């Protein structure tokens, strides 16, 4: 069990964040059309998994905006923005913001993702949501970079994630 903070208060996180060199766990999440989306849907592409609690928080929204800008510059790479938000909320946010370069995925029917990727917040006011993390995968789903952000209210290290590509 890892521990991060939320505005300085300790929060327990269940599961193990995939480490560099490891094979990423398979997953099934929910896309904007409510269909199941798996890791295999992105076979042959590099993947940036931007994992966060909710797009309705300022830091999470900022991470989606920043990765959207970067995603437009990346060849053979998809940026997956993964949260517990309903697909409707994710679609509404990206539509209102004009964000078209990221793929939103919900843990709505894929709760096992949270523990398999070591981001399941187990205590505190955000229990049941995802901790903030970034996992970068190559075309064969090997982990190139992973970061569990120590303070949930902080942004991830974008430069380190993008440099891993």
Swiss-Prot record:
Domain Thioredoxin: 18-165
Principal EC category: oxidoreductase
Any single biological process term in GO: cellular response to hydrogen peroxide
Catalytic residues in the record: 60 (cysteine sulfenic acid (-soh) intermediate)
InterPro entries: Redoxin, Thioredoxin-like_sf, Thioredoxin_domain, TPX, Tpx_CS, Tpx_Peroxidase_subfamily
Disulfide bonds: 60-94
Signal peptide range in chain numbering: none
Keyword Oxidoreductase: yes
EC assignment: 1.11.1.24
Keywords associated with the record: Antioxidant, Disulfide bond, Oxidoreductase, Peroxidase, Redox-active center
Catalytic activity of the protein: a hydroperoxide + [thioredoxin]-dithiol = an alcohol + [thioredoxin]-disulfide + H2O
GO MF entry, a single one: thioredoxin peroxidase activity
Keyword Plastid carried by entry: no
Coiled coil: none
Family (UniProt): Belongs to the peroxiredoxin family. Tpx subfamily.
Record text on subunit structure and interactions: Homodimer.
Note: The active site is a conserved redox-active cysteine residue, the peroxidatic cysteine (C(P)), which makes the nucleophilic attack on the peroxide substrate. The peroxide oxidizes the C(P)-SH to cysteine sulfenic acid (C(P)-SOH), which then reacts with another cysteine residue, the resolving cysteine (C(R)), to form a disulfide bridge. The disulfide is subsequently reduced by an appropriate electron donor to complete the catalytic cycle. In this atypical 2-Cys peroxiredoxin, C(R) is present in the same subunit to form an intramolecular disulfide.
Purpose of the protein: Thiol-specific peroxidase that catalyzes the reduction of hydrogen peroxide and organic hydroperoxides to water and alcohols, respectively. Plays a role in cell protection against oxidative stress by detoxifying peroxides.
Full protein name: Thiol peroxidase
Organism: Pseudomonas aeruginosa (strain ATCC 15692 / DSM 22644 / CIP 104116 / JCM 14847 / LMG 12228 / 1C / PRS 101 / PAO1)
């Amino acid at each position: 069990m890892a521990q991060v903070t939320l505005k300085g208060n300790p929060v327990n996180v269940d599961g193990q964040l995939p480490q560099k060199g490891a094979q990423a766990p398979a997953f099934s999440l929910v896309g904007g059309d409510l269909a199941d989306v798996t890791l295999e849907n992105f076979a042959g592409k590099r993947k940036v998994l931007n994992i966060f609690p909710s797009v309705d928080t300022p830091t999470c929204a900022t991470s989606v905006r920043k990765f959207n800008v970067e995603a437009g510059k990346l060849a053979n790479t998809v940026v997956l923005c993964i949260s517990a938000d309903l697909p409707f909320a994710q679609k509404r946010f990206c539509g209102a913001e004009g964000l078209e370069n990221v793929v939103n995925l919900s843990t709505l029917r894929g709760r096992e993702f949270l523990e398999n990727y070591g981001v399941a917040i187990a205590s505190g006011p955000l229990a049941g949501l995802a901790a903030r993390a970034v996992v970068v995968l190559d075309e064969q789903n090997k982990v190139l970079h992973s970061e569990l952000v120590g303070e949930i209210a902080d942004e991830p290290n974008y430069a380190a994630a993008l440099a891993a590509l």
